[in-house]
Amino acid sequence: MEAFKDPVIHIYINSCGGDAYELFGLLSVLDVAKSKGISVHTHVIGVAYSAGSILAAYGDHRTMSRYSDHLLHLGCAGAEFSTFEQLKREAENNIKHFNKILRIYSEHTKIPKKKLEEMLKDDKLYLDAEQCLKYGICDEIT
């Protein structure tokens, strides 16, 4: 197979979110691409909510349209359990999951983990393009 002349993956995002476990799988694929010298550019052309926001922040170069918004939050948790041990195990898994999300944002933005925890204490944080630029969630407003 011929080598790519421009080793860049462009991902255009207009997403209300999705399953975090599927997102983590996609981020792992992007890590493999990055390890092969392929750059990942993300472009928010609508909204980047929840998992879409994490994907957008993961790019090596990140753009947003001036009308775009991000929604940052730590995810949703909850289900019916029949035993206390099941509930306890699910809570432990959710804490690991939330910490993984915090780590991804803190590694790929200008927001330190402690500051992000404070910003998300009320669960959901909506940010417009200017705010995303300020916090290093995007690199450029288009």
Model-derived features: where do they sit?
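Short, well-ordered alpha-helix to beta-strand connector turns
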Residues: D6, G59-D60, C138
